[in-house]
Amino acid sequence: MRDIEKFIRGFSRFQEQYLKEPTALDSLRQGQHPRTLVIGCCDARVDPALLTGCDPGDIFVVRNIANLVPPCAPDAPPGVSSAIEFAVCGLEVARIIVLGHTMLGLMQLSPRHSRRNP
């Protein structure tokens, strides 16, 4: 239950911070216009907005396991490629950043690692 209380307190702080400045969210009401797409890992320790000090609307973020970008194929799931296409073609981002990190949990589960460390 403590997690939920922490989320509620955090959301309340967010609302207080952004609502005390009446124009803070005005531009966001008009839609999103980020200039950067960040492809990052879904690891809970690596939050692109928190790490870069960005405000809401500054970056468009795609997160997945190990920040992998699978090749676009007709029979492949469209999640990552669709998000990238939306960012590039729809939002017209100026840059793409792939945000990697150390101690990647996926590598702990890789077949090679599993054979060495049963």
Role assignments for model-derived ranges:
Residues 1-78:
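Short, conserved "active-site rim" segments that organize catalytic pockets and cofactor/ligand binding
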Residues 50, 56-118:
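Short HxH-centered metal-ligating active-site micro-motif
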